[in-house]
Structure formats: structure tokens, C-alpha cells
Curated annotation (Swiss-Prot):
Protein name in UniProt: ASTRA-associated protein 1
Localisation: Nucleus
Main localization (coarse): nucleus
GO annotation terms (biological process): chromatin organization
Keywords: Chromatin regulator, Nucleus, Repeat, WD repeat
InterPro entries: WD40/YVTN_repeat-like_dom_sf (IPR015943), WD40_repeat_dom_sf (IPR036322), WD40_rpt (IPR001680)
WD repeats: 11-54, 57-95, 113-157, 224-263, 273-309, 313-350, 420-449
Function field: Component of the ASTRA complex involved in chromatin remodeling.
Gene field: ASA1
Disulfide cysteine pairs (residue numbers): none
Amino acid sequence: MEPRQKGALRGHKNPITCTIVFKDHKRNCNTLVTSDNEGWVAWWDISTKRPLGVWRAHSNSILSVVQIDHNLLLTHGKDSCVRIWAITQYEGFSKTFPAENHTESGSHRWPEYVEIPVNTLNFCNVCYLNGKLITPATQDSNNFDIYSIFPASAAHFPDIESRLSLRRIVANADPLALHKKAKSKENLTMGIDFEISDENSKRDGFGIMMKVVFVSPTLFYIGYESGHIIGFSLTEYKPNVNVKSKEGTTKAFDASFINKEPTLEIIYISAFHCPHPITALFFHDKLYAGSAGKTLSIHTKQSSIAEEPEIESYNLKIAGVQDIAVLPELAIVAFWNGVVKGYEKQSTEAESDQRELTTDFSTEPNTISQFKPAWKMSRDVPRIGTLESNNGQKEAQELPSKVKANTLCILKSSAITHSSYRDLVRARQVSPRLLTVGYADGVTIMYEI
């Protein structure tokens, strides 16, 4: 069934760059956070379609927005900083957007926040999970750093400045060097005692980071400019060890005394999308990847680089994947040309029938098809076409172009507690599942799916 529009969130005067679900634990409901390329952030009540708070989080475009705790929101901007905001005390927020071309934010109250300086020389996002933050490296945009920012021991502190304990646990990790190390280890396992030339060493590594996604506290994937997708395993040793003395007392010693630093290892690498830069990554049981090309790939997790990659590939017939969202029964892809398409996942029993029926979503040779085109949608840019000039001569009418869909986000409604009767009624009217699409004209539209 084609998505049905349920509402629009208007106010941003610039292209939307991020849309994420923010779980409001105070009211026990899901809300939405949007950002734009002028640094403005809006926190939305879905039932009323009105902002709970609006503020300018950065002086430049926002690249990443992530909820990292019950009341903390992380934003990452092109102004070379990551900021962490305590946003649940929203009663004092401004709830109005600035006028068009107005960037002064003095009248908009800022939430309490702390700041972390990071490298933003490229357009890669940052990624957070369980107290760890991955960012492009300070020294080299081709490499990456990993920070520990919220240790478990500080969880009881009342304010974010007290809880923040910034520690860089991995510095300037070089994927090319790690790949050579992994290949050498594999060669030794196979009994090969000489170095095999690496095609990646003939060029400037893998290029800059494009996308990064955490899968678990010990596993993450990075997509590169070269088109490679690399899976990294992170092993972090416990910071303290307990030693029992002869008298029976126990003392704790810092593990740094025995040089137990976190270790990184490459356990997966795919050159499937080369030479097209990776533009979208999404993990849902498997890793879904899109690039500047026309192909969607699905990668199965593996535990060693020695294993043969299991990749399913699909010809989307449209070049340039902007974003990907995946549900158990549906995959949604946004393209650079403004089209958003949905693909239903099919059971294996229906594969032969699907190959006969599918004309718009074919697979590459030797792959297994699991999808069927379900719907596609787009928004036209409003235009006034001139059919005749003043001298009466007919002129060619310009075809309308599409509004680019920048972001995709799946939002599931949840019950509101400790709220007014009016809010409870409004919450019942919200669809159980919404697809939110952030567009380049600053509008975020919600579709029932």
C-alpha cells in the first residue's frame, strides 16, 4: 500500500539534514528531532505537530543527531564540534522558528550542553553507542578516532558536565594499515610467508570516511570514498583489575599499568561498490548499503576477514542512493533525484514468481531476490510555467523537478502517560507507524505506512 500523508512539520527555512526519533521518557512517548544546514534544531511533538523547542545548535550545517541517553541529545556540526544537550527541561525553550534569512539566535534559549571539538573536514557522520563515540580523526580525515565520553561510573551524576569524562581510547586509526595487518595475519594462517601486493596501497588508501554505523559495542562498519565497506572489531579491556592480598583485602589497580589498550581488528571488507563512494548505511539484522551507483547491497555479518563475504545485490535502476530505512517487511530507499521507493520483502517460496513479475527491481546475476517493488513517491517543486511570451510566440514549458528527499526515519507511536486528557486524545489519532521524510525545502512530511 502506498504511503498516505498524515501531516507536515514546517518551520525550517533550510534543507533538512537529519531526522531522528527521540524517546521522551518524561512523558513516555516518541518524539521527533529535525535539523537543517544552517545549524537549527527542532524538537517536535508528533501528536500536535508543534515544536517543543527550537534552538540553533551549530553555526553551520548539522551532520549527525543522536539520542544518547534518557534526556541527552548529541549533535555534530560542520563548525568542528560535537555538542551534547540536556533537552528534557523544555518548558523554557523558544517554540518559534526564526524568520527567513535570519540567523541570529539570541532570542532562542539554549539547553544546557557540553562541547567536544572534532574534525569536520569531510561530510561523514559521527556514531555513538554505549558511551563510545566514533569520529573522523583529528589528524587525518581518512582515519578515525574513538572516544569514551560517558563512563558507567559517572551515570549517577546530576548534570552532564559532571558526567562527561572525555578519553580518546583509539587515536588516528589507519584502515589501510589495519587491512595490511589483517591480510598478513591471514597469510600466516594459510602458510604464506611472503607479502601479497595490495591494490589499495597503489592509491591513497580507501579515501575519506563517508558513513559509519555501530552494530554493537564491539562491532562497527565504515563506508569509504573508494566504495569499500570495512567492518571493525573493537576489543576494550576492563579499566580496573582486583588483586587480593595475603591478608584477604582486595585492591584495585588501573589496567594501564599493564598496557592493556583497546585493540582494533578488521574482520570484514567488501569492494562491491567500488569505485562508487558509499552514501548510505543501515543495519537491520544485516548491513544495507547504497552508493553513488545504482545498486543496493546487503551484507551478512562475519567474524573474520578470511571468510568469503556473503553479499546480496539489487539493481535499483536509479543512480545515487541518499538514505535507507528498513523494516522487517519493507525496505525504503531515497534517491538523489527526489524519488522515494518502497520494496516489500518476499518469502523464498515466492522468488520464482517474483522474478516473472518484477520489472523495476532486478537483481545482479547469481544473487537471490527477496524484494518486490511496492510503491514510489516524489514531490514536485511548485512552478509557474510560461506557455506564451509577450509577443505571442509559444515557448517550451519547463518540466517540474522533484524536491530532494534528504532523510528517512521510521517513527512508531507510543502511549502517553502523566499527560492531559487532550494530549491523550491526540495521541490516539497518531498512526501506529510513520515514515518521516526530511526534504530539501525544509519540510518534514509524515506518511502512514
